[in-house]
Amino acid sequence: MKGFNYKLATMVCAAISCTWALTSTVAIAAAAAELPVIVQELVAPPALPAPITRKNPARVVVNLTVEEVEREIAPGTRYMFWTFGGTVPGKMIRVREGDTVELHLQNLASNKLPHNIDLHAVSGPGGGAEQTLIAPGNEAVFTFKALAPGLYVYHCATAPVGMHVANGMYGMILVEPKEGMSKVDREYYVMQGDFYTTGAYRAEGLQNFDMQKAVDEKPTYVLLNGADGALTGKNSLTA
């Protein structure tokens, strides 16, 4: 179009877009600031946080640590697990539809590697992975709104992603619907994981991660809740 300044128009549109985005961000932050603050209870699986009884949204603060811990994967067999909160799976996060979630991810100084978190309950690419990629000794904080009810996985998305997940960096986030959930007698939190060790099944001593077994999809262990016998014997789940 003759006489039309496309560059100026583009700059004006960009400025309007930036202003709208800034205004929206400020508005969301202001609304969240007015909500009651609740610190998420995190418990070791197979336990999980209690059902939500409140009828209104809240600002839920989740303090999650990344811990690289050596412990038994089977009797006499040890393994270096990479975990959220020191457990496999990582401790369940439980929020309500409409909640604003403020997630603090701390990578302990004793760890050796960078890690992050990708929550599939988060809208947008990466699920928070880009905002939370941190080296040992650092902490990242990001905020999101729980928009859609459902049960979602979360996991570390640091490359190589498969290795971080196979070493135990996965868990669940439950977004309860606004109307709540049906009452049940008991709730348990169970996830299956594949583990790939250099030694054979139940080979004694400290076993390392075997990348070739992982590539070939030939796990040494297929476990519930990260350990051989985690849900049997004295750890059996009761009805």
Spans of model-derived segments:
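Histidine- and aromatic-enriched segments that form or immediately flank copper-ligand environments
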Residues: 61-175
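Bacterial N-terminal signal peptides that target proteins for export
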Residues: 2-12
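Bacterial N-terminal signal peptides
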Residues: 10-24
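Boundary at the C-terminal end of the N-terminal hydrophobic targeting segment
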Residues: 21, 26-33
